[in-house]
Amino acid sequence: NTNPAPLLSVVMPAHNAERTIKTAARSTLMAMPANAELLIFLDACTDRTRQELEAIHDKRLRIIEATNQHGVAAALNALLAQARGRLIARMDSDDICLPWRFRSQLHKIGKTKADILFGNAVLFGRSLRPFGLLPQFPIRLSPQQGALALLLTNPFVHPSMIGTAAAMKVLGGYRETPAEDYDMWLRASLAGMRMERSAGYAILYRVHDNQLTQQAAWKQKLQKDNSLFKTRADLAHALLGFEIPMESDLAIVSKAIWSDNRGGLI
């Protein structure tokens, strides 16, 4: 490509997203600066996802299409390989990008010198009662707080992310795991990268009944992911000097961190 490299590449994998892709793409393009690109990976789509995108006439939009299904991690790695920006941001094909997102995030990542920066999300969907909206608490997480929170849960909303292309390269992209985002944040923290979450809202995050992370099969695969739990154990050793239980129960893990027999962290 002979055009100058953009400042920002936004990557979006999509599989059969005909009902939501146009809104996701348009809201992202509206929020992006002029010197940015939106890369969308069509992962073996069999519906009208491509036709919906072809109705959008914007030179910043690039479509990559695969006939064989890759899955999220492989699709994201294919997008990272094509991205030309110094900064990389994520979006999902069923979410909505808020208009101020990139203006705010570009300012903050430059100011904080973070390797990876996240925003907060407003959850939306018919299953959320009574109004269909549920904002996350607008709380900032410092790099130190974020690293500790990773031992308890995944505190970061993946499609709210913006990070440096250099950081993505050092991490080697995404690994094939049920929780490819959580795995990457654990590895980034273990590598000493500066990750933080700003208090402001970046996206509207769609919640629906057939969400992958709510399915029993996905949860079973996650429990068997030894590589992820090893990375989590390594991070616990690096931060705390002791292991934490494998149980996912928040109270058990919190007790292990704050009530260590050497006095914990306080």
Kindly give the residue locations of the regions a language model identified.
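N-proximal low-complexity "stem/linker" segments adjacent to membrane-targeting elements
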Residues: 1-27
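Cell-envelope/extracellular polymer assembly enzymes that use nucleotide-activated donors
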Residues: 6-9, 37, 183
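Short, acidic, metal-binding catalytic loop of nucleotide-sugar glycosyltransferases
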Residues: 26-35
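A conserved acidic beta->alpha catalytic loop
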Residues: 42-51, 68, 92
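Glycine-rich, basic loop-to-helix element that forms the pyrophosphate-binding segment
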Residues: 66-83, 104
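Short aromatic/hydrophobic "clamp" motif used to bind/position activated sugar donors
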Residues: 88
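Conserved donor NDP-sugar-binding/catalytic core segment of glycosyltransferases
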Residues: 100-132
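Conserved nucleotide-sugar donor-binding catalytic segment
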Residues: 141-224
